[in-house]
């Protein structure tokens, strides 16, 4: 079964073609600057690599371009569009309506549209990608894989805020958690790597990148996630503030004469390690280099980030009454060995000891804790596209079984 995985943003569209039987990535690419000047990147497992300017007025143009590339006689990996069995779409926010992957029907699109207020930057862009694919491949099965679905096993004690309950009843204001596709893949891969049954282990996954979240997974089910009603809550991130006292926002608004939209822009785009470093950078590599040159604010930004991560790990270990695996993933989690080491220095109370040599290894999966460590600490390369393909293939298989 060949799966086309689509991750549609407001002005970009990432894609992969995956053979679900072998899990081989046949082709991958990126359509950027849609509606502006347009850029198309395309690579195949056969060694073809293309990057070229391509005018794309809208997402339909982008999908048409990627499909044309996939079936090109010289550069393509497919004989025709008909070889695509399923299109798996990454959908950011499904609210409480969706607890798993679903066939994208008109009813699903309507339900997602009703969730647009919960993710105004992401959901409309996701749906534009769906519409473009439906227009060009009307007979192909479309499956939606929600970034919030994996977190829907959280209990009310974890997802409710200390607000009047009527606001939850009326507006569904609660904690949803994000990065669920990544957390699901990485927690399962960690258990597989360690030869464990995921239904018998307690895992904390640290998805650390420009956007960061931590997820507590007990026996295969999420019990908590550091992100909340929006991806703004939780850790200090690249440009996002993470947890902050709401009272400070009222104070700031009064002092700086700011409205709510200006405040939200600051919290989302001007805060995090970028803000702490006095606008030096949101890139952890650049902050590390600056810290080596005695830039105190750059070092402080990284220090605060590591401290907050360690605090969440400690609280989730308590919430699960123990932890078997702690897993680092995503751009910072996979590649910044110094940050991992700094985080783990706070976790000695859990009996964690880190192997300095292993911690600097680059691999798809590696255990970086010493053999005597009471908790397994791992680095696992996330693969959201593969997880989407797996879930899309599973939905397609269920439909096929129902017909037989």
What are these regions (language model features)?
Residues 338, 355, 359-400:
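Glycine-rich phosphate-binding/hydrolytic loop that grips phosphoryl groups
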Residues 256-301:
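A mobile "lid/hinge" subdomain adjacent to the ATP/sugar-phosphate binding pocket shared
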Residues 186-193, 300-321:
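Phosphate/ATP-binding catalytic cores across multiple sugar-kinase/actin-like superfamilies
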């Amino acid at each position: 079964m060949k799966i086309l995985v689509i991750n549609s943003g407001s002005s970009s569209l990432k894609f992969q073609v995956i053979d679900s039987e072998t899990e081989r990535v046949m082709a991958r690419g990126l359509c950027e600057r849609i509606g502006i000047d347009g850029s198309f990147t395309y690579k195949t497992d056969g060694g073809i690599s293309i990057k070229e300017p391509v005018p794309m007025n809208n997402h339909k143009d982008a999908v048409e371009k990627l499909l044309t590339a996939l079936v090109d006689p010289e550069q393509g990996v497919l004989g025709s569009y008909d070889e695509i069995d399923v299109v798996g779409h990454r959908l950011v926010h499904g609210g409480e309506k969706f607890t798993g992957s679903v066939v994208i029907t008109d009813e699903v699109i309507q339900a997602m549209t009703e969730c647009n207020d919960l993710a105004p930057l992401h959901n409309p862009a996701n749906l534009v990608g769906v519409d473009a694919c439906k227009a060009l491949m009307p007979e192909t099965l479309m499956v939606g894989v929600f970034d919030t679905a994996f977190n829907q096993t959280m209990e009310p004690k974890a997802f409710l805020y200390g607000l009047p309950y009527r606001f939850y009843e009326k507006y569904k204001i609660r904690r949803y958690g994000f990065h669920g596709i990544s957390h699901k893949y990485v927690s399962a891969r960690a258990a597989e790597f360690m030869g464990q049954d995921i239904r018998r282990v307690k895992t904390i996954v640290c998805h650390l990148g420009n956007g960061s979240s931590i997820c507590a997974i007990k026996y295969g089910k999420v019990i908590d996630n550091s992100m909340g009603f929006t991806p703004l809550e939780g850790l200090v991130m690249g440009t996002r503030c993470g947890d902050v006292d709401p009272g400070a926002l009222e104070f700031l608004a009064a002092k700086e004469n700011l409205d709510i939209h200006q405040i939200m822009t600051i919290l989302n785009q001007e805060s995090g390690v970028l803000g702490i470093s006095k606008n030096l950078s949101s890139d952890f590599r650049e902050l590390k280099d600056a810290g080596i040159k005695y830039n105190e604010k750059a070092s402080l930004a990284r220090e605060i980030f590591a401290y907050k991560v360690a605090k969440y790990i400690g609280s989730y270990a308590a919430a699960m009454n123990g932890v078997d695996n702690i897993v680092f993933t995503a751009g910072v989690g996979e590649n910044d060995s110094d940050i991992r080491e700094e985080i783990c220095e706070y976790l000695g109370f859990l009996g964690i000891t880190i192997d300095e040599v292993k911690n600097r290894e680059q691999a798809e999966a590696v255990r970086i804790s010493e053999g005597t460590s009471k908790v397994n600490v791992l680095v696992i390369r996330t693969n959201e596209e593969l997880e989407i393909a797996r879930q899309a293939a599973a939905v397609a298989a269920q439909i096929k079984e129902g017909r037989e």
